[in-house]
Amino acid sequence: MPARRGVAFACVLVLATPLSFAARTAIGEPATSPGPRPLRAEIGVEWAVGTRDGESQKLRLHVEPELDLALPRGFRLKGIGRLRADAFDELEPGQPDQAEIAPYTRRLDFGDRVDAELRELFVQGRIGPAWLRVGKQQVVWGQADGLKLLDVVDPQSFEEFILPVFEDSRIPLWTVDVEVPIDDAQLQVLWIPDTTMHDIPPRDGLFAFTAPRLVGEGPPPGVPVRIEDPNRPSDPLRNSDVGARLAGFWKGWDLTANALWHYDDIPIPFRTIDLDAGVPQVRVAPGYRRTPVLGGSVSNAFGNLTVRGEMAAQLDRWFPTDDVTDRDGVVRTTDVGWVLGLDWYGFTDTLLSAQLFQSFLTEHRPGVIRDQLDSNVTVLARRTFRHETLTVETIWIQSINDGDGLVRPRVEYAVRDDLQVWAGFDVFYGTRDGIYGEFDENDRFVIGFEWGL
């Protein structure tokens, strides 16, 4: 309890300072931004309060120092660290074992409420015509908003489901990234000797997965279940990932062709049923399997309208089945997904965006716990005011198949270039069987800030 009060006091104190500064700036006090420096830092606080029970879900302080140093021959060394302190420890209670994370990529835990992490550390520069970046980094594929399709190079932390921005929820990996020009195109080649997978919330976490399509159907009442830790591949050489992307421009269209040989970052709930003792016993041993990905993206602007598209075929994906006669409780198939996005800028200072995500299983056996064609729709409305310093937006994500979804209204104010404050709501709806509806009790109000130092 003293530790919680201490962290909470520090977070509230830091939170109050930029909010009062924002109020003074709004009534006319001048503010200036610091110039570029090789060593910078960002400090921020976000407070999330459940709207149903009034209980705090998190009050988290984060400090992110950033290094940018010039090296000989035009190379640069860049690094980002992150220190976090949470007053309530509801997202991942206790000290997570981080079984899904490779040892050289894990966070350092200091008790239950404080952790430190090396987010990025890489050297980049040119060698002849090639551009090289080596080290811990993020690799971004695709342009979809709200949900992901082609952006599968880096795994993701799901401690707050899909609520954080992708830049914060991605788990940077140790990667060799080489980009070489080929005529008017650009070839990117990746080698990733990092066996980190998605960071899945523990079963007592606030956003722990419970939807059957993610974790499989539960056994009948009274049947004991033993769930083991995920069996993560551990050899950084033999189990490394490789990928390539060819990007170019043709008749007004930005085009990419993408290929990735990697492990699916979602643990597969392999299941066995033991009948030897006379009473059925269920054992779930999550594991990972290779999933080749082939895809691409297109985009073009037609006046005020931008058209975006992505496609990704995951050739070997495993899905849970409720067929009790199935040997391991999962089936293998090919998952072909695509997204079509339209961005309209026809109104002053306004963006209206809509996306259709669809995923099709080429083989859909009886008992598979998801429809053969799965569809989601997203709608984004964003308007800026006061010379683009005040942003008001709402994003709506809707599952067509399950009827559940997520609505996220938000207001953000840029007090100055290095100080932003915001407030908003995250509202889930639907049944517990849906990917969004499983968090229907977790609706929340959030307020926070980020301040560059």
PLM feature spans:
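Repeated loop/turn-to-beta-strand initiation elements of outer-membrane beta-barrel proteins
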Residues: 39, 74-77, 129-132, 184-187, ...
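Residues that define the transmembrane beta-barrel architecture of outer-membrane proteins
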Residues: 49, 55-63, 114-119, 170-174, ...
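Outer-membrane beta-barrel "beta-signal"
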Residues: 155-158, 439-453
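Detector for outer-membrane/organellar transmembrane beta-barrel domains
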Residues: 260, 299-397
